[in-house]
Amino acid sequence: MKFFVLFAILIAIVHASCASVPKVVYDGPIYELRQIEEENIEPDTELMDSNEPLLPLRHRRVTCDVLSWQSKWLSINHSACAIRCLAQRRKGGSCRNGVCICRK
């Protein structure tokens, strides 16, 4: 019974860490917005460069910071990162400075 509970918790953790990874990048049309009249803009504000693409926010530290704990019976320090990398079809990985680094 203890093994089943630990296995269920591990499956829930793997599912939660894989759910935060975007699976598909949007390739549809991107429509331009109209230009704002520059005379209404305050001189102290900086405009964002329109040539830089907006990248999605990635939370890479969850598997290494939150899941990096060990007890007397169980330690999942680098194994959570390795499972996350295997789910991304990579060859495993490890935690470095709180960030999960996957092997190629």
UniProtKB/Swiss-Prot annotation:
PROSITE patterns: INVERT_DEFENSINS. Residues 1-19 form the signal peptide. CDD domains: DEFL_defensin-like. Keywords: Antibiotic, Antimicrobial, Defensin, Disulfide bond, Immunity, Innate immunity, Secreted, Signal. It is found in: Secreted. Low expression in head and thorax. This is Defensin-2.
